Amino acid sequence: MNIEIIPAMDLIDGACVRLAQGDYDRRTTYGGDPLDTALRFEAAGLLRLHMVDLEVLERIAARTRLEIQYGGGIKSRTALCDVFSAGARRAVCGSVAVREPDCLAAWLAEFGGERLILGADLRDGRIAIAGWSEETPLGAAELIGRFRKQGLQQVICTDIARDGMLCGPATSFYAALQAEFPNVEITVSGGIATLGDLTALDRAGLRSVIVGKALYEGRITLEDLGRCLPNE
């Protein structure tokens, strides 16, 4: 399998949680130290970690070799630099791409497309921003197209309706989006439930996928992922 598998780590009060469709009232909390969880990811051979907590990010960056991509509330260059200083290798920018596209374009020029990821979160085919509370008329392709010539290299595209629902990803949609932008890595997020989902995405030509709830609930195990590492 060639697709890169990126575990997700969302935290509330220092504990790993998974939300259903981003709803904090429908969250499941998983015990254990997040650092121990990250160390298990690393031991399994995973290379990247997707997370949204700066304090825990610093601990994990200092104690593992995982490449951390951080997303959540990056609205200024100062905030972006804080994320990098905390140890993140990549930063995910969503709302700022819609509200201040010139700002993201400038960051892409300064930091490079290998460090800046566009966050494209979709509800009913339209981009949602501000923690998914505000919908826009933009589609994913339109938003990606705005930054294709600005050095954009990676997009995390989250299907909000499927996030945390274990219902399977919208594979055909992602495959079409990847085909439209062959020079941009489209990272799938939302709905992953089984190894079969990962296999289908891999066969469809997707390059990376974020796995959250299925991993924490044991539907996909670290042993499974260890056998699915790229080119193994």
Q: Can you name each region flagged by the protein language model?
A:
Residues 10, 41, 49, 83, ...:
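Conserved, mostly hydrophobic/aromatic
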Residues 12-25, 81, 88-163:
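Conserved anion-binding
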Residues 30-41, 75-81, 135-146, 198:
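Short, acidic/polar
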Residues 48-59, 95, 157-167:
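Glycine-rich, proline-tolerant flexible connector loops at the mouths of alpha/beta enzymes
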Residues 50-53, 69, 92-93, 117, ...:
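Conserved beta-strand positions in the central sheet of alpha/beta enzyme cores
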Residues 56, 63-90, 172-208:
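Catalytic cores of alpha/beta
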Residues 56-58, 133-142, 167-175:
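Charged helix-capping and loop-helix junction motifs
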Residues 81-103, 159-162, 190-197, 204-224:
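Glycine-rich phosphate-binding active-site loops on the catalytic face of alpha/beta enzymes
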